Regions:
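A structural signal for well-ordered alpha-helical scaffolds and beta->alpha junctions
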Residues: 28-31, 97, 145-148
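Residue-level preference for long, well-ordered alpha-helices that form the structural scaffold
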Residues: 24-27, 89, 137-144
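A phosphate-binding catalytic loop at a beta-strand-loop-alpha-helix junction
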Residues: 54-56
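An alpha-helical support segment within catalytic cores of ATP-dependent transferases
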Residues: 1-52, 157
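Alpha-helical structural elements of signaling/regulatory helical domains
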Residues: 23-26, 65, 95, 109-110, ...
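Active-site Asp-x-Gly
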Residues: 62-103, 107-109
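Helix-rich C-terminal or lid/interface subdomains of diverse kinases
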Residues: 102-159
């Protein structure tokens, strides 16, 4: 069953560094120093079934808006709930995202902090598996030299 946590490995981090030629980015050193603690958090986080493929075209809404049904379950997997929150928010406008979060309710800030780090590695790993590095992963490469260190530091506060 699909699990993003399976992609958070030292081997995949090394492969990303090599394929993207970002070995010298200071964020990698900080991530590797904290890898064991982050992996421990990843093992301990509350687990659930995750959809992993939210996009509005994968949803059918009743004509009277009384119910909705998601379909296209090829990425159905296991993980922590915030992965689906991230996936939903990534495809919504800012206004729609605020409405979604209002209805969704509270989420664990430690889980979000964990996802803010792990999802970068997972997404870069998946991008590096492609023959040509995709445009949608470029912002994450840029993040290595900007906000990724801050995200790792924030996550350390939850350890």
């Amino acid at each position: 069953m699909y699990d993003e946590a399976d992609f958070f490995t030292l081997e995949n981090i090394a492969s990303i560094k090599d394929k993207t030629e970002t070995q010298d980015a200071p964020a990698w050193g900080l991530l590797e120093q904290n890898y064991a603690a982050i992996s421990d958090l990843l093992r301990k986080v509350r687990r659930t079934i995750t959809y992993n493929d939210f996009y509005y075209t994968n949803m059918v809404v009743a004509k009277d808006n009384s119910s909705a049904l998601m379909f296209d379950y090829n990425l159905l997997g296991k993980g922590y709930a915030y992965t689906d929150v991230r996936n939903v928010l990534s495809s919504l406008s800012e206004e729609a995202g605020k409405a979604f979060l209002k209805e969704y309710g509270k989420f664990d800030p430690a889980e979000k902090a964990l996802d803010d780090v792990v999802s970068v590695v997972v997404t870069l790993h998946l991008a590096c598996l492609r023959e040509n590095f995709p445009w949608w992963a470029q912002t994450l490469l840029d993040e290595l030299n900007t906000t990724f260190i801050e995200k790792i530091e924030l996550l350390r506060r939850f350890q």
